[in-house]
UniProtKB/Swiss-Prot annotation:
This is Large ribosomal subunit protein bL20. The gene is rplT. Belongs to the bacterial ribosomal protein bL20 family. GO terms for molecular function: rRNA binding; structural constituent of ribosome. Pfam families: Ribosomal_L20. One of its GO terms (cellular component) is ribonucleoprotein complex. Keywords: Ribonucleoprotein, Ribosomal protein, RNA-binding, rRNA-binding. Binds directly to 23S ribosomal RNA and is necessary for the in vitro assembly process of the 50S ribosomal subunit. It is not involved in the protein synthesizing functions of that subunit. InterPro entries: Ribosomal_bL20, RIBOSOMAL_L20_CS, Ribosomal_protein_bL20_C.
C-alpha cells in the first residue's frame, strides 16, 4: 500500500473550521483546536436557541395580550377562554400585534369575549 499523506484534506478541514470561527475572540478564531471546540459549542447553542426562540416569543405574545386584556378589566385566561367560546380563531401572535398596534380592534375582541362569558 502506498503511504497516504493527509496534508490537503487536513488543511481543507482546518480552513473550514477557522472560517466558521471568524470573528471569535482571541485563540478561538486562530488556533484550530480551540476554534473547533468553539464552533461545536456555537452549533449546540444555535440548535438549543432555535427551539427556545419559539418559547420566548410565545411568552412575549402572552405578556402583551395579558397587559392589554387587563387594561380592559379582563385577565388573559378569561380572555382566551372567551375567544374560544366565541369561536374566534386568532392566534396569539396576531392577537399581540393587534393589542400593540390597534387598541380599538382589541377592545372589540375583548367585548366579544366578555359577551360570551
Amino acid at each position: 500500500m502506498a503511504r497516504v499523506k493527509r496534508g490537503v484534506i487536513a488543511r481543507a478541514r482546518h480552513k473550514k473550521v477557522l472560517k466558521a470561527a471568524k470573528g471569535y475572540y482571541g485563540a478561538r478564531s486562530r488556533v484550530y483546536r480551540v476554534a473547533f471546540q468553539a464552533v461545536i459549542k456555537a452549533g449546540q447553542y444555535a440548535y438549543r436557541d432555535r427551539r427556545q426562540r419559539k418559547r420566548q416569543f410565545r411568552q412575549l405574545w402572552i405578556a402583551r395580550i395579558n397587559a392589554a386584556a387587563r387594561q380592559n378589566s379582563l385577565s388573559y385566561s378569561k380572555f382566551i377562554n372567551g375567544l374560544k367560546k366565541a369561536s374566534v380563531e386568532i392566534d396569539r401572535k396576531i392577537l399581540a400585534d393587534i393589542a400593540v398596534f390597534d387598541k380599538v380592534a382589541f377592545t372589540a375582541l375583548v367585548e366579544k369575549a366578555k359577551s360570551v362569558l
